[in-house]
């Protein structure tokens, strides 16, 4: 199979891009994809599709208020999107301005504090390095003066509802600048139902970066360089995966961020390594999955690396058929949209 970036394009009517969440977290639709079989369900049906002894792995990252507006020392307006807080006084960011700021220049953000641009950052130099130019703490300043960073395809500014609904109910480790959106469908009652049915849960942390929205700027998929994100897998989660494997249960990743962390830390026997690391894993058709058996995920952007990931997991032709079905049936797309439950049916022979 020889695929290009254009092979992951699909027509999407703009009105199918969800601008607001469903009235209830579990109120979204769920498209169950098992090979060529497509079944339209409700997300509330999920507990009936799992069995006792299965393990759901969630990403417990919490979205920080990463967007700032301000003024450059030259007087021009600037918008800053934090990519990562490195420590209390240093951060990496994206910059939107009429002209990119130079190293050594300063910016006044939220009319409250000043930062200094120290240079370019990131594998391709797409990000900028910041340091505080006065006493302070980026974590505290973000919480006090920052704005919630909604995705670029959501057209309204962050509202009070977004402060709650663009976080998972189990978010506890601050650091993401985009939500792990598959988890947005779970509410406390569903988590309790899953536990009562003997379906186990475990957590890891992967801080989703703004790079998740970056378009691919290459024609050949092999030429793309993935952004890097940091993840942490605690001992309890690694132990839960080992126990699930030994008992014949399935490991179900809640979201592509959980899947990327698990596969990055995976061993050939389906277990995972404990600890923290950086990952720039780029999963495309032909990838051999080692850890994850099923995947819960939202619908992804055309020509995106995440669409390639789900195509690798469930099969390229199956995903194309599923997305065409979703468009025809008026499913809601992207972060606030509906969900999919994917069975792992991709084959190494699908390699691009």
UniProtKB/Swiss-Prot annotation:
Electron transport: present as a keyword of the record?
Answer: no
According to its UniProt record, in which pathway does this protein act? tRNA modification; tRNA-queuosine biosynthesis
Catalysed conversion reaction: 7-aminomethyl-7-carbaguanosine(34) in tRNA + S-adenosyl-L-methionine = epoxyqueuosine(34) in tRNA + adenine + L-methionine + 2 H(+)
> What's a single GO MF annotation on this record?
S-adenosylmethionine:tRNA ribosyltransferase-isomerase activity
Note the InterPro entries from the entry: QueA (IPR003699), QueA_dom1 (IPR042118), QueA_dom2 (IPR042119), QueA_sf (IPR036100)
GO terms classed as biological process: queuosine biosynthetic process; tRNA wobble guanine modification
Keyword S-adenosyl-L-methionine part of the UniProt annotation: yes
List the GO terms this entry assigns under cellular component, sorted alphabetically.
Answer: cytoplasm
- According to the UniProt record, which cysteines are disulfide-bonded? none
User: Keywords on this record?
Assistant: Cytoplasm, Queuosine biosynthesis, S-adenosyl-L-methionine, Transferase
Q: Where in the cell is it found?
A: Cytoplasm
Determine the domain of life of the protein's source: Bacteria
Enzyme Commission number, as recorded: 2.4.99.17
Alphabetical list of NCBIfam families matching this protein: PRK00147.1, queA
Record function comment: Transfers and isomerizes the ribose moiety from AdoMet to the 7-aminomethyl group of 7-deazaguanine (preQ1-tRNA) to give epoxyqueuosine (oQ-tRNA).
Assembly notes: Monomer.
Please report which protein family the annotation says this sequence is part of.
Belongs to the QueA family.
Which PANTHER family does its entry note? S-ADENOSYLMETHIONINE:TRNA RIBOSYLTRANSFERASE-ISOMERASE (PTHR30307:SF0)
- This chain's protein is named S-adenosylmethionine:tRNA ribosyltransferase-isomerase
Organism per entry: Dechloromonas aromatica (strain RCB)
